[in-house]
Amino acid sequence: MEQFRKRILRPSVALLMGTCSAGMALSGRPAMAQNRKPTAREVVAAIQEHVGIPWQKETVDTFKAGNPDTPVTGIAVTMMATMDVLERAAANGQNLVITHEPTFYNHLDRPDGMDESDAVWKEKRAFLENHGMVVWRFHDHWHRRKPDGILAGMVHAMGWEKYQQEENPYLFTMPERTLAVLAAEVAKKLGSPVVRVVGERGMKVTRIAFSPGSAGFVRETHALEMDNVEVLLVGETREWETVEYAADAVSEERRKALIVIGHVPSEQAGMEECARWLKMFVKDVPIEFVPTKQPFWTVADGGN
């Protein structure tokens, strides 16, 4: 179970973060000079101070765009800093974007095999520069926080607190329902029109494992093979790995099922929780949760 709990952390670029100035008016700090806004660097230092766990040297939680010493006029907290999110943030005067997932199409925000002259990538970088925006990623430490910030927000969004197991917060024991009913409930609560399911529609289920985001084949299959897991909910996964494994388990008449929610809806509420948390100690600038739009539409709904 411990292996199932852990997140994979990969090396990233060097940290570009300093210490918070003595004049910063964040919770627990002296009031700053009148009318002075905190810089992005100071906001991040306050996050490091309040997150409740040691800050790791090797992390993707770094600045991805902009000058960290930019005074912050507003903070947009989001699941993914898509072009749409950046445009909405800029229109609202939010020049610091705190994103959970990458901004530039790769875990380290260095898209392999893509030339810097690529039109889409270039326009996104230019937009950030032209609007004086700063992007900082908050992934590893938000997951490592106790409890995991993403998991806490998602469990609250689904209303599953009373079903959560104390010894492993990623496992849930709930009243019996069919797999089809469970999938429909998850889709409705998370606002995801693209939920996909592997398994028998009418199978009665009570024991659920939840793996938000993209945990990978090893952790996903280890979860599915557990005796106390009938259904695994994931954000996204490769179809020729975990999906095929789940399909084979069903063909072998094992009581197993897989629900694929979509990466964004599987973690979105966790970043809404992050915005609520930030407001507890960042008092100098407005903070808003800016939801990332679901990028997919289906033929069945006509794209509505």
Located regions from the model:
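Hydrophobic structural segments
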Residues: 2-6, 13-304
